[in-house]
From Swiss-Prot:
Its main location: nucleus. Probable transcription factor. Residues 37-61, 89-112 bind DNA. This is Transcription factor MYB86.
Length: 352
């Protein structure tokens, strides 16, 4: 509570009232009435402010004040008025004659609140504490469940986003890009992305077979991409052109050896491979002895067969790359004949 301006200008007393001050104030108000409270201290001969005189008269010196404890009727009336008006103590004091607002407030805070709580009534809402506690617990449970639902949905969305990010980062799972050891038939699988021709691959295969005496795994720089899936299936299901050519000239022994190498069996014996090379050489020598009339006749007999075979296989297998088939039919016939002629001469020289 703020003080009047006169309290700062004049040297006024503060604190407890003495009995002499109470007597002076009581005699003045009994004779003249209180009138204007700001002029009462000066007229009564008190070194107090008007507000202090008013509160002292209303709360302590007034003759109609009730002294002593509150009755049961007054307690019930205070509870009813507090339920209707709340903490408006001055309005409650007007309904209780002889009681001050300060006295009623002190009695409420010190006594009536505790009585209501012992009876199971909330002193603020004047309702049973059980229902209020249950409602508060329900509100708390609703808040907790809503927060848990929000957290669970957020965690599910995060997991879904992480799985989508991981799947997008991994990409399509076809084959490892750094695979170096592949099947022999994969060396003859041609597509639009592979720039090397089939003829170069066959020449490298023939040179490696003629120069090396030990079996080595066939390596290729061809790395299959997802768009080469059909070409890979085609090469794995349809018999290879190289297998058909060499089986036509060298017999079934080459086919069996190629199947063994396609299975990638690490237990292939070097001795068996050497015997297979000798059998192939004997077959080639037998073939050249029956056709020693002229080398041109061999080329004339071999080239149409090779060309026709490749043309039939390219047209029947429905390869997606028609340009490679046309190039195989037009430009690579002479290369195959020359390579076979070199191979025949090499085997013939080794036999001598």
């Amino acid at each position: 509570m703020g003080r009047h301006s006169c309290c700062f200008k004049q040297k006024l007393r503060k604190g407890l009232w003495s009995p002499e001050e109470d007597e002076k104030l009581l005699n003045y108000i009994t004779r003249h009435g209180h009138g204007c409270w700001s002029s009462v201290p000066k007229l009564a001969g008190l070194q107090r402010c008007g507000k202090s005189c008013r509160l002292r008269w209303i709360n302590y010196l007034r003759p109609d004040l009730k002294r002593g404890a509150f009755s049961q009727d007054e307690e019930s009336l205070i509870i009813e008025l507090h339920a209707a008006l709340g903490n408006r103590w001055s309005q409650i004091a007007t309904r209780l004659p002889g009681r001050t607002d300060n006295e009623i407030k002190n009695f409420w805070n010190s006594c009536l609140k505790k009585k209501l709580r012992r009876k199971g009534i909330d002193p603020t809402t004047h309702k049973p504490l059980i229902t209020n506690e249950l409602q508060s617990l329900n509100v708390i449970d609703q808040k907790l469940t809503s927060s848990e639902v929000v957290k669970s949905t957020g965690s599910i969305n995060n997991l879904h986003d992480q799985s989508m990010v991981v799947s997008s980062q991994q990409g399509p799972w076809w084959f490892p890009a750094n695979t170096t050891t592949t099947n022999q038939n994969s060396a003859f699988c041609f597509s639009s992305s592979n720039t090397t021709t089939v003829s170069d691959q066959i020449v490298s295969l023939i040179s490696s077979m003629s120069t090396s005496s030990s079996p080595t795994p066939m390596t290729s720089n061809f790395s299959p991409a997802p768009n080469n899936w059909e070409q890979l299936n085609y090469c794995n299901t349809v018999p290879s052109q190289s297998n058909s050519i060499y089986s036509a000239f060298f017999g079934n022994q080459y086919t069996e050896a190629s199947q063994t190498m396609n299975n990638n069996n690490p237990l292939v014996d070097q001795h068996h491979h050497h015997q297979d090379m000798k059998s192939w050489a004997s077959e080639i020598l037998h073939y050249t002895e029956h056709n020693q009339s002229s080398e041109t006749v061999i080329e004339a007999e071999v080239k149409p067969d090779i060309a026709n075979y490749y043309w039939r296989s390219a047209s029947s297998s429905s390869s997606p790359n028609q340009e490679a088939a046309t190039l195989l039919h037009d430009a690579n016939v002479e290369v195959y004949g020359k390579n076979l002629q070199k191979l025949n001469n090499m085997v013939f020289d080794q036999s001598l």
